[in-house]
């Protein structure tokens, strides 16, 4: 609360002058405050709730580079987990926000001040009425990313677009047992705008043993005792990742979707193997158990 208030209070200072150096200075100050907030949350994880972290793949990372982080999205706990895990390891994580969030009092100002890239999506009905808008969301996302060039940066993208739950899993007719279908739009924009500057793509797989989708209450009240995270470092043009030439081609969407589907197949096998080794319940059993106990948070 205090950190959020400080960021909001500093927004007028950032807006005072249009000079790039001035605004960059205040952005760095606000990111420092955001980093302090993450440090406090991480301390709560480690000291108060004594959560056991099982993390693999955190090596040869740099605070002064640019990274794209991809992750499965299981719960509201995912963001504090990723922020805490990467704190002081890579730059402060930013993520795409919906344009509507900018109009939320105080929150919108803070998100703008932290230079969160804004995404505006059009519904199928809107595109049917206005076919000229097709592709505009991708172009806007690409331009938002271009404004973040030439600075240390981490962009976090939950590729599934939403948190998993039984109804969404069923509605999508997902081919995966533990995941929703990956969406390529946001990744496409990032790779086109920043692909030549990215140090690495970090493919993150989060697993909560005993839970498919834990709530914040499970964390706060100590029911979430263990968190497993696998980080796979990838480079453009290697490890099956499309090359810069493919990313900038007319067939970029096809190449990126194919690659993401391959990554999600690997992620599915990784989760399945880990849960089998731990003797965990099947996906459907865990979801049915959690659906019977609503999360108050």
Predicted regions and their residues:
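N-terminal membrane-anchoring alpha-helices
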Residues: 1-50, 288, 293-297
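Catalytic core of membrane glycerolipid acyltransferases/transacylases, capturing the structured
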Residues: 12, 16-37, 63-130
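A short, well-structured juxtamembrane/interface segment
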Residues: 43-67
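Short His-Asn-centered micro-motif
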Residues: 57, 70-73, 97-100, 158-160, ...
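A cross-family acyltransferase "interaction/gating" segment
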Residues: 102-122, 149-244
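Surface-exposed cleft-lining segments at the edges of enzyme active sites
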Residues: 123-135, 174-177
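Accessory terminal regions of nucleic-acid processing enzymes
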Residues: 243-297
């Amino acid at each position: 609360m205090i950190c959020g208030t400080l960021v909001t209070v500093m927004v007028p200072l950032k807006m005072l002058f249009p000079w790039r150096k001035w605004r960059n200075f205040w952005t760095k100050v606000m990111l420092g405050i955001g980093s302090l907030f993450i440090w406090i949350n991480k301390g709560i994880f480690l000291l108060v709730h004594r959560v056991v972290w099982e993390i693999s793949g955190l090596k040869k990372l740099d605070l002064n580079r640019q990274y794209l982080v991809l992750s499965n999205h299981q719960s509201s706990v995912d963001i504090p987990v990723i922020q805490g895990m990467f704190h002081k390891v890579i730059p402060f994580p930013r993520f795409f926000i919906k344009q509507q969030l900018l109009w939320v009092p105080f929150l919108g100002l803070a998100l703008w001040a932290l230079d969160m890239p804004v995404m505006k999506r059009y519904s199928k009905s809107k595109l049917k009425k206005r076919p000229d808008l097709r592709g505009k969301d991708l172009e806007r996302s690409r331009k938002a990313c271009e404004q973040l060039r030439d600075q240390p940066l981490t962009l976090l993208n939950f590729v599934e677009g939403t948190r998993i739950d039984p109804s969404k899993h069923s509605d999508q007719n997902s081919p995966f047992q533990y995941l929703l279908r990956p969406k390529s739009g946001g990744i496409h924009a990032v790779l086109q705008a920043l692909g030549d500057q990215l140090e690495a793509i970090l493919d993150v797989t989060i697993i909560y043993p005993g839970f498919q989708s834990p709530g914040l209450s499970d964390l706060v009240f100590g029911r979430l005792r263990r968190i497993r995270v696998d980080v796979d470092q990838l480079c453009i043009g290697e490890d099956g990742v499309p090359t810069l030439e493919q990313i900038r081609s007319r067939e970029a969407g096809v190449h990126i979707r194919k690659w993401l589907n391959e990554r999600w197949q690997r992620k599915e096998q990784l989760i399945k193997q880990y849960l089998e080794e731990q003797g965990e319940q099947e996906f459907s059993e865990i979801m049915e158990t959690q659906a019977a106990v609503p999360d108050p948070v």
